[in-house]
Amino acid sequence: MSITIQNLNKHFGNFHALKNINLNVPTGKLVSLLGPSGCGKTTLLRIIAGLENADGGNILFDGQDVTAKHVRERKVGFVFQHYALFRHMNVFDNVAFGLTVLPKSERPSKGQIRAKVEELLKLVQLSHLAKSYPHQLSGGQRQRIALARALAVEPKLLLLDEPFGALDAKVRKELRTWLRDIHHNLGVTSILVTHDQEEALEVSDEIVVMNHGKIEQTGSAEAIYRKPENAFVTEFLGETDAFEGRIEKGFWHYNGFAWKLDAQYKWQEQTATGYIRPHEWQIAAEHETPMICAEIEKIHAVGALTHILVKHDKQDVHITLAGSDAARYPIAEGKELKLIPKQVYVFSQNELIEYSI
């Protein structure tokens, strides 16, 4: 089922929570609403579900306007951060619950319900826990059961509100891979709310980056990461360091270093900020003009990566090198490091000037 959102607005008193939201979610895609707390992503999810009313605009499911329809009529499945499993019911009954409360005319037979629940428990790989109760399960197992329960009623749309937020990092990573596989197998149109950039980049077919009630950028995970359209998206999608430079004659200049801008973009001479991610630095060769010369303050090796903190012009700059690259150079605290970037994202007044191709 496709989702179309047209000119959606929502106020809470004087607070404008959603500002003219327009969005298309293609059939069968997993789309993440990504943004910081208070950006409007959960409010948008609740309006799509029918749990909240918009002040203006329309929501269409497969081209049919459902803006005024009750949540029960929208055939939506929910998975929340805190599971919402019934403590007094075992796993089997929790998964079956949505089917048992359907109107009599729509309710499957007991045999059909049993077959459906067994199928879903097999899908989430928890058939052996059918008789267990929620308090006997781990957090990851509870969330799998919550998803199985949401899928039991065969929703046309699956909505997930920070489903892994309460779990530890290792379990979150495991469940992200699992969710991606489940979605690939079922093909249910799904919308995931998250503030976790890594989660969105890993599981999504498309990402919608939100801030202050507006959509900043929509695109594939690769496009959002490789071609950010403004400074907010660049900074929100991972650690960056910012450098104030100037655009002149098709180059962004900083500290004697020049970064050539793409000729297809219009530019004018102006001040502009260059953003560089930690892993997009490299140590300058003898013949290269470095962008910065900085003293190493801290070195921290983590597995195959070496994280380096340097001080440049009273600014902390973060560098991440592959262990093999770090081993080729005499890196030590207190020594000077000459660096050039592999990529610079350049913006002027939050407007895109350059991105990687």
UniProtKB/Swiss-Prot annotation:
TM segment ranges: none
Name of the encoding gene: cysA
E.C. number(s) listed in UniProt: 7.3.2.3
Similarity field: Belongs to the ABC transporter superfamily. Sulfate/tungstate importer (TC 3.A.1.6) family.
Main subcellular location: membrane
Lineage per the UniProt record: Bacteria, Pseudomonadati, Pseudomonadota, Betaproteobacteria, Neisseriales
Subunit structure: The complex is composed of two ATP-binding proteins (CysA), two transmembrane proteins (CysT and CysW) and a solute-binding protein (CysP).
Location(s) in or outside the cell: Cell inner membrane
Membrane-related topology note: Peripheral membrane protein
Protein name, as recorded: Sulfate/thiosulfate import ATP-binding protein CysA
Keyword Lipid metabolism set for record: no
